[in-house]
UniProtKB/Swiss-Prot annotation:
<feature type="disulfide bond">
    <location>
        <begin position="228"/>
        <end position="237"/>
    </location>
</feature>
<feature type="disulfide bond">
    <location>
        <begin position="274"/>
        <end position="287"/>
    </location>
</feature>
<dbReference type="InterPro" id="IPR008263">
    <property type="entry name" value="GH16_AS"/>
</dbReference>
<dbReference type="GO" id="GO:0042546">
    <property type="term" value="P:cell wall biogenesis"/>
</dbReference>
<keyword id="KW-0378">Hydrolase</keyword>
<dbReference type="GO" id="GO:0030247">
    <property type="term" value="F:polysaccharide binding"/>
</dbReference>
<protein>
    <recommendedName>
        <fullName>Probable xyloglucan endotransglucosylase/hydrolase</fullName>
        <ecNumber>2.4.1.207</ecNumber>
    </recommendedName>
</protein>
<keyword id="KW-0808">Transferase</keyword>
<keyword id="KW-0964">Secreted</keyword>
<feature type="binding site">
    <location>
        <position position="110"/>
    </location>
    <ligand>
        <name>xyloglucan</name>
    </ligand>
</feature>
<keyword id="KW-0134">Cell wall</keyword>
<comment type="similarity">
    <text>Belongs to the glycosyl hydrolase 16 family. XTH group 1 subfamily.</text>
</comment>
<feature type="site" description="Important for catalytic activity">
    <location>
        <position position="108"/>
    </location>
</feature>
<dbReference type="InterPro" id="IPR013320">
    <property type="entry name" value="ConA-like_dom_sf"/>
</dbReference>
<feature type="active site" description="Proton donor">
    <location>
        <position position="110"/>
    </location>
</feature>
<dbReference type="InterPro" id="IPR010713">
    <property type="entry name" value="XET_C"/>
</dbReference>
<feature type="active site" description="Nucleophile">
    <location>
        <position position="106"/>
    </location>
</feature>
């Protein structure tokens, strides 16, 4: 009887382990200058609390931005952001990874400004080998201008997962077997910027930036970077397979995370390129891996 019970417990444990996934590790908050440097219009960057908080300012003359000191192949990257409040129509606050060549890879968070009282739109996109056009858009389920919220990317050989706080909002699976290029051999820097894009950002460019409301300010803190640092010319991570994000529990979402993703898709998604039959005659191959399409 004891042997039978022990065998049963072993089977149950094996089944549970096969289904285990995990949330990314808790980010470590650090000062801005540990990982980042300004890229342009440094006079429009304001440092608060010894550089643990940074405010980007946009006016009619210029926006501004910053980038990481290093480039990375895979990892976990997050930022706490408080978006531009009030009438932010025409503005874009961006947090993204990008390589530096013509056939570039890129992983985007873009926050599209709104008229006062209208919800913010978060647009995500993935470029691989210079090909993008993979936009998805959601309405955020909270006011992102009232407090800081975490926006993060988990990028490994198996998937690119986008998170808002602890909620997954998008998963882009490695579909190399379907003939789809996947970002895996181009180190990327992280960037963030605040800029004017009133030719397209709000209602397709119909809503213009009201410069009487300037300056527009977006605030940042956290500055978490946990990645495999590599030169821009590197094609692989020297510790590939040994990092925490390479382990089996981080190769897919778990059941609870997929339920949260399904909730985002059902309640908050307003555009998904995978279902845009007017724009695309045939569904992109990688969309076959999207559970909610």
């Amino acid at each position: 009887m004891k042997a039978t019970a022990g065998a049963l417990l072993a089977v149950v444990a094996a089944v549970l382990l096969r289904g285990v996934a995990a949330a990314p590790r808790k980010p470590v908050d650090v000062p801005f200058d540990k990982n980042y440097v300004p890229t342009w219009a440094q006079d429009h960057i304001h440092y608060v609390n010894g550089g643990r908080e940074v405010q980007l300012s946009l006016d009619k003359t210029t926006g501004t931005g910053f980038q990481t000191r290093g480039s990375y192949l895979f990892g976990h990257f997050s930022m706490h952001i408080k978006l531009v409040g009030g009438d932010s129509a025409g503005t874009v606050t961006a947090f993204y990874l990008s390589s530096q060549n013509s056939e570039h890879d890129e992983i985007d968070f873009e926050f599209l400004g709104n008229r006062t009282g209208q919800p913010y739109i978060l647009q995500t996109n993935v470029f691989s080998g210079g090909k993008g056009d993979r936009e998805q858009r959601i309405y955020l389920w909270f006011d992102p201008t009232k407090d800081y919220h975490s926006y993060s990317v988990l990028w490994n050989l198996y998937m690119i997962a986008f998170f808002v706080d602890d909620t997954p909002i998008r998963v882009f699976k490695n579909s190399k077997d379907l003939g789809v290029r996947y970002p895996f051999d181009q180190p990327m820097k992280l960037y963030s910027s605040l800029w004017n894009a009133d030719d397209w950002a709000t209602r397709g460019g119909r809503e213009k930036t009201d410069w009487s409301k300037a300056p527009f300010v977006a605030s940042y803190r956290g500055f978490h970077v946990d990645g495999c640092e590599a030169s821009a010319e590197a094609k692989f991570c020297a510790t590939q397979g040994a990092r925490w994000w390479d382990q089996p529990e981080f190769q897919d979402l778990d059941a609870a995370q997929y339920r949260r993703l399904a909730w985002v898709r059902k309640e908050h998604t307003i555009y998904n390129y995978c279902t845009d039959h007017d724009r695309y005659a045939a569904m992109a191959p990688e969309c076959k891996r999207d559970r909610d399409v």
